Amino acid sequence: IGNLTARKHYTAKDKIEAANQALAAGIATNCGDTYNDKEVIQAAKDGRINMVNLDNVCRTMLATMFRNELFEKNPCKPLDWNKIYPGWNSDRHREMARQAARESIVMLENKDNLLPLSKTLKTIAVLGPGADDLQPGDYTPKLQPGQLKSVLSGIKAAVGKQTKVLYEQGCDFTTPDATNIPKAVKAASQSDVVVMVLGDCSTSEATNNVRKTCGENNDWATLILPGKQQELLEAVCATGKPVVLILQAGRPYDLLKASEMCKAILVNWLPGQEGGPATADVLFGDYNPGGRLPMTFPRHVGQLPLYYNFKTSGRRYEYVDMEFYPLYRFGYGLSYTSFEYSDLKIQEKSNGNVMVQATVKNVGGCAGDEVAQLYITDMYASVKTRVMELKDFTRIHLQPGESKNVSFELTPYDISLLNDRMDRVVEKGEFKVMVGGMSPDYVAKDRIKDSVGYSDNKKGVTGMLDYTHEFGADFTLAVSKVEENLTNNQKTVWISVKNVGTLMDTGKVEMFVDGKKAGDVVHYELAPGEEKLIPFNLNKDNDKSVAFTTKYKMLPI
């Protein structure tokens, strides 16, 4: 609320005016100190705060607190983790953290099958500002000494005594100091393979002019690795030694040069307290990576915004100076084995649901996880739609030579759209249905939806559905009851909103008094046949016209 002043938004001259604006808008809670400010409290005592608005937000807040028994069960006492759950940092919990980190790691490159590495290599160089500085992510609670295990410590624990591990930071995360890059280059030149850990700094206690690169209020204008990290990467790659890049980050970075220079690339994100051992598990083949990208990695910052599910355009899909296609697309990720897809089956059921099945086979030499992803493309619709949309996915584990059937069921809501009236509807028509291990290709410069699909069965399978059902929501409004409040000069009007249509949809109910919006806007989500009762408060002596609206319908009372 304090941001309404000159601190940010300039809609209020001081905190008192900001508090009045917030109370008028029904803001009951404050992330900050405006409502606790001594001047604001004194202003309330002096009558400079609108007491009607203050009463309204207090009523809302107290009702919520009573409903949740917050006065009987105070949740605001200082927390003692050992009393709440004595085993919170037990071996079992650490193993769970390690498994979660393993499952999330994404392998982007593995040229010449460099990975997995041998645990009997003579010398490994572990370089970079993140190598011995695991990043936990923004808003991480205070950690115990030794709780965070770095990639360096994970590698040292994984290899045998005969393997020498060399470590050099090379540079820090963000400063322009490059004086230690030659030390890293020397270590790389003495090694059989280089593991570089580069990326983000999320630590709030960053010092020595090292800034956070991610988290709240930390934005970067480019996607180049911060500080001297890109220079460090290029200098080390110039030694000719095979380089494994581990991107420790919570965002995409520009990895175009890295993809050309490095033999292998892993993204271990901000991997939690067991991130180092988990990364080592993948590096040395104790765990076969099966993570998939939850975001698109562009070739260049100039491609942004870049989403897998972009809407069709009135122009061609190309750049003059580079490919339109991203470097690594949404849902992408490699494995130490290979998979093939076949036998796509698509069936529309009598209730409008769509059954989709496909067979996935492990055609490689080791066991591994595959993430089978279901995408659809609405080929022709009454409004512009996205070129593809992810609708479901499942992660399966397959032994070498093993096949499994993956099955998905789409509901009408899954293939619905918002029409030109912003109503959610399902339209008849042609849909492209795709199941694969990554998001589908889209390589055309024009007629983009026609090009969406998989080029071979190692990526996925594609089929067509001629959908024959139509669905839509329809809402009714009615006054359910009116209650007189015995403790104040108000009455409560209970409004019934019901979905009498055939599709789940969302909406909002608004109250107008004398043609002006009054009270809170209440949002709802209703399935077919579902009804919700919504209370609105009115003064008992109100003699002005009152009406309620939702979805182009008005109910005067």
Model regions: which residues?
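Second-shell residues forming the walls of enzyme active-site clefts
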Residues: 1-32, 38-39, 45-53, 60
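General structural signal for secondary-structure boundaries
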Residues: 14, 34, 77-78, 150, ...
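C-terminal non-catalytic regions of proteins with extracellular/luminal or membrane-system context
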Residues: 4-8, 38-49, 63, 87, ...
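Short coil/turn segments at secondary-structure boundaries
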Residues: 34-35, 56-57, 72-79, 116-119, ...
